[in-house]
C-alpha cells in the first residue's frame, strides 16, 4: 500500500546540516532561471498527492560543483516545476541530470531524486552565459543569458523539494 512519508527535520537538525555543509570545501557555480509556463502543463506532470500552485513556474538550475578534497569538478542540474502539497509550496523535480555516478546514486537511491547521468555544460564568456543538459547525445535543455550586474544575496529562507520514492513490488504487481 502506498503511503506518504515526510523527511521533515527539526530546527536543530537543519542547523547541524548547515554547520556540516560549511565544514567542507564545496563550491558551486550556478545558473538559475525561473519562468512562467502553462498551468495545464504543470498539472499534467504532477503526480498525486501534489497539486498545481497559484503561480505556474519552472525552475532550471545548471551548475558545476567542486567538492574539493582532490575530487574532480562535476556537473549538476535540476528541471523542476513549482508544486503544492496541502498547504506547503515547493518544487517537484522532473529530472536532475548529473555527470558522475557518485552524484547520481546517493540522491536517487536514498531520497528518490530523479537523477540521471547526463552531459552538463555551464560556460561564461564575458557577460554571456549558457548552459545545457544532454543525455544519450540529445540536448534536452539549453539556456542562455547575459550578466547585467550583481544581485543582492537571497534572504535566508526554507526551500521545500518534493520527491516521490517507490519501488516496484517483487511480485510484479504494484509497488512495495
Predicted regions and their residues:
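Hydrophobic/aromatic-rich structural module bridging two neighboring secondary-structure elements via a short loop
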Residues: 65-111
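Acidic-enriched, low-complexity/disordered segments with a strong bias for Aspartate over Glutamate
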Residues: 12, 25, 38, 66, ...
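A contiguous strand-loop segment
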Residues: 3, 84-89, 119-122
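Internal, well-folded beta-alpha domain core
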Residues: 91-176
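Hydrophobic residues positioned within well-ordered beta-strands of beta-sheet architectures
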Residues: 31-33, 79, 131
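N-terminal domain-onset segments
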Residues: 1-74
